[in-house]
């Protein structure tokens, strides 16, 4: 009897972990966008007017729970919880629920950035949250949950990142560290996540996952409800989980401890793709991109060029401030069949703490758009750059087609096919790429979706004529506005 029960439990755990890697995308859609710090009402409108029609699969939204109000309203205040009430600068619970429903109705899934590791850091005196809840973080008193000091690990500072105890039981940058082995803490976290599932979300991005023991997270994940069938999810669907685990390959707490529980953020992807398109590594080496570079297996890796944290750091990571290289890196990211892809949608920043665009009363303002659909009032909206949303369409068009026809010049000019459905070429050299290349596409004329769009049968940018052998003449000048060209079967003139 015991052996049967144990086997049954292990099988259930295995099936749950496998299910938690499924993002529940509609049809052939397969790209997530992080609409960082957007309001819920604006996200709902964006799903209906842009993301759905452009074929985006889902949105990662900023934390939904009540947070501390910090002076100047820096973005990171959202990562300092006061309670699990669904009231933030992005909106209230009613507005959040309306957004989730409207996005699901147009095939765009919602993934919530959730904070299970900690509550707010120290605050002088009584802190007031975005829903008006009072707390005394220094005393570890959060009546809005409620949590008291007994629900937290003892106060200590992380001084040695090679010490597992410190990494997982001390306070990350002073944030009060919850004890996830506590039955009470577990129950409150599960209750919070289950409420979001009831409202129709498809899954969660788990912040600071490496700072929590994997066995505690496994318990929490396995205790969650199935996704809400009223929002179009099949019966017995499990929430998609992707976990923030920063692992550069030499960490005491490894990404491998979490990869079977759900997807894991592959930070090495971000660093190495930045190195390549900054010119620090020849593009020819990208032929073995993915597990050949020591990355996680494709289905366990959440991949990105930059995220809301590392785009603010110096180093190899590319961001919107290097637009030509950034668009090339994003095109490669979305064209190469590796990982679960997420693109960034930022707001402009001058320093690490810059808040999102806000009015004189410190209320987040809605994005505004010019005649081309680009954002103009402090929002960057990379997802609205033609070169990026066109590659979301490219990724949808080629879907599961394999890499074929790799070509390179031994340096920084490369091209490859995605079966007979798509073709990409890149030029990161200081001289032109002018070459007859195998596009692997059926004969015909194709619109380069990077330089233009196919409108009423005509291409507004470059076009390439492919002969009966699949070859076409490819030209990317060293001083072209974009260093990449993309063709696919859904953009045939």
Curated annotation (Swiss-Prot):
Cofactor: how and how many bound: Binds 1 Ca(2+) ion per subunit. Binds 1 Cl(-) ion per subunit.
Active site residues according to the UniProt entry: 207 (nucleophile), 244 (proton donor)
GO cellular component: extracellular region
Record-listed Ca(2+) binding positions: 117, 168, 177, 211
Residues where chloride binds: 205, 307, 342
UniProt KW Nucleus keyword: no
Residues of the site described as Transition state stabilizer: 309
Signal peptide coordinates: 1-19
Chain positions found as Pyrrolidone carboxylic acid: 20
Group of enzyme by EC: hydrolase
GO MF terms held by the record: alpha-amylase activity; metal ion binding
Complex formation: Monomer.
Family as reported in the entry's similarity comment: Belongs to the glycosyl hydrolase 13 family.
Protein name per Swiss-Prot or TrEMBL: Alpha-amylase-related protein
Species: Drosophila mauritiana
């Amino acid at each position: 009897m015991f052996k049967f029960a144990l086997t049954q439990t292990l099988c259930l755990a295995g099936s749950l972990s496998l299910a938690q890697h499924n993002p529940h995308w509609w049809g052939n859609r397969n790209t997530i966008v992080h609409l960082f710090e957007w309001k819920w009402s604006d996200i709902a409108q964006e799903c209906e007017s842009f993301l759905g029609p452009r074929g985006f699969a889902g949105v990662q939204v900023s934390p939904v729970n009540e947070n501390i109000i910090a002076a100047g309203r820096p973005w990171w205040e959202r990562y300092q919880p006061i309670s699990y009430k669904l009231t933030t600068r992005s909106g209230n619970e009613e507005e959040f629920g309306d957004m989730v429903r409207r996005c699901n109705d147009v095939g765009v899934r919602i993934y919530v950035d959730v904070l299970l590791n900690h509550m707010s850091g120290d605050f002088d005196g009584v802190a007031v949250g975005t829903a008006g809840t009072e707390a005394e973080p220094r005393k570890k008193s959060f009546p809005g949950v409620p949590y008291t000091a007994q629900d937290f690990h003892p106060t200590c500072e992380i001084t040695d990142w090679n010490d597992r105890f410190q990494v997982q039981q001390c306070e990350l940058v002073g944030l009060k560290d919850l004890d996830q082995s506590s039955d009470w803490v577990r129950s409150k976290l599960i209750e919070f996540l289950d409420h979001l599932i009831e409202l129709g979300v498809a899954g969660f991005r788990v912040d600071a996952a490496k700072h929590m023991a994997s066995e505690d997270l496994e318990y929490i994940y396995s205790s969650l409800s199935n996704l809400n069938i009223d929002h179009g999810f099949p019966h017995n669907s499990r929430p998609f989980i992707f976990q923030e685990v920063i692992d550069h390959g030499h960490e005491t707490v490894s990404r491998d401890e979490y990869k079977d529980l759900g997807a894991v953020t592959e930070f090495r992807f971000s660093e190495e793709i930045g190195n390549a398109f900054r010119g620090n590594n020849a593009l020819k080496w990208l032929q073995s991109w993915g597990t050949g570079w020591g990355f996680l297996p494709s289905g366990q890796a959440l991949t990105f060029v930059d995220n809301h944290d590392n785009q603010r750091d110096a180093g190899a990571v590319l961001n919107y401030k290097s637009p030509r290289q950034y668009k090339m890196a994003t095109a490669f990211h979305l064209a190469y069949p590796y990982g679960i892809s997420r693109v960034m949608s930022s707001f402009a920043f001058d320093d690490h703490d810059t808040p999102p665009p806000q009015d004189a009363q410190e209320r987040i303002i809605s994005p505004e758009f010019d005649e081309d659909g680009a954002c103009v009032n402090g929002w960057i909206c990379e997802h609205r750059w033609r070169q990026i949303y066109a590659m979301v369409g490219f990724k949808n068009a080629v879907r599961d087609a394999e890499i074929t026809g790799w070509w390179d010049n031994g340096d920084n000019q490369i091209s490859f096919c995605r079966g007979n459905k798509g073709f990409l070429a890149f030029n990161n050299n200081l001289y032109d790429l002018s070459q007859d290349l195998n596009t692997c596409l059926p004969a015909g004329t194709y619109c380069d979706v990077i330089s233009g769009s196919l409108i009423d049968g005509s291409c507004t940018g470059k076009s390439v004529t492919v002969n009966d052998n699949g070859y076409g003449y490819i030209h990317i000048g060293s001083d072209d506005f974009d260093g990449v060209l993309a063709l696919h079967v859904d953009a045939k003139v």
